[in-house]
Amino acid sequence: MTKIRTVSDAKRKFFTHYSRPISSIYRRFVEELLVEMHLLSVNIDFTYDPIFALGIVTSFNSFMQGYQPAEQLPAIFNALCHGVDQNPDQVRQDAKNVAASAHHIGLDAWVTAAASEQASGDNLLLNTLTGIHQRHKFKYSRLFAIGLYTLLADQDPEVKDNDEKRQDYLTRLSELLDLSLDKVVKDLDLYRSNLEKVDQLLKVLEDAAEAERKKKEKQAASTTPAIEEAPVTTAESSES
């Protein structure tokens, strides 16, 4: 009997791939994302798909904004994926490919694919939606909802601010994919609310950094000795 991996196993594997300390402001998000990805990975009904991959990448990029040192972000992302036995390069590539496949495809095509019993063509997004529709059991996740929302917002930017249009899109797709609309809306409302909090936090951090910079400049200026006039020599005095 195969032993089911535990959260502790996932965390241990994460720290094997990334042992540096993570800034406290971001540590909680990284831990929560790791646990969420782990619980899905060990769920018998869960199946990885490109929309889910886009949700991972989008969520990570959104909530890790402002992290310093920024050059450590790829390593942290890699460790997250390795922690749940996923290939970080594949996750990134799948996210990129499904986002690209959504370009220039109207919502009507999405709806048709989500209601179809058979894949048609080679469009990754449409085939993913068809595959989900055909699946006997589809394990919904918050990360899938974020991926779907990202695609919708990229297709129609009004989705971000137009509640009625966003609700209409989500209602149609949730019905066809047999998703709980209440869960989808609740998860996305929380996601959007948290994004606003991140923006506010970044503004506070920027203001604090600017205030600290000005303080240091002021201190440096106040401690710089003034240039004194050279004293007049005896010879110069006698000449005058």
UniProtKB/Swiss-Prot annotation:
Nuclease keyword on record: no
Region feature (Disordered): 212-240
GO biological process, one term: photosystem II assembly
Coiled coil regions, renumbered to chain: 186-222
Superkingdom of this protein's organism: Bacteria
Gene Ontology CC: plasma membrane-derived thylakoid photosystem II
The keyword Nucleotide-binding is annotated on this UniProt entry: no
Pfam families listed in its UniProt record: ThylakoidFormat
Annotated family: Belongs to the THF1 family.
Protein name: Protein Thf1
Species, as recorded: Synechocystis sp. (strain ATCC 27184 / PCC 6803 / Kazusa)
Source species taxonomy: Bacteria, Bacillati, Cyanobacteriota, Cyanophyceae, Synechococcales
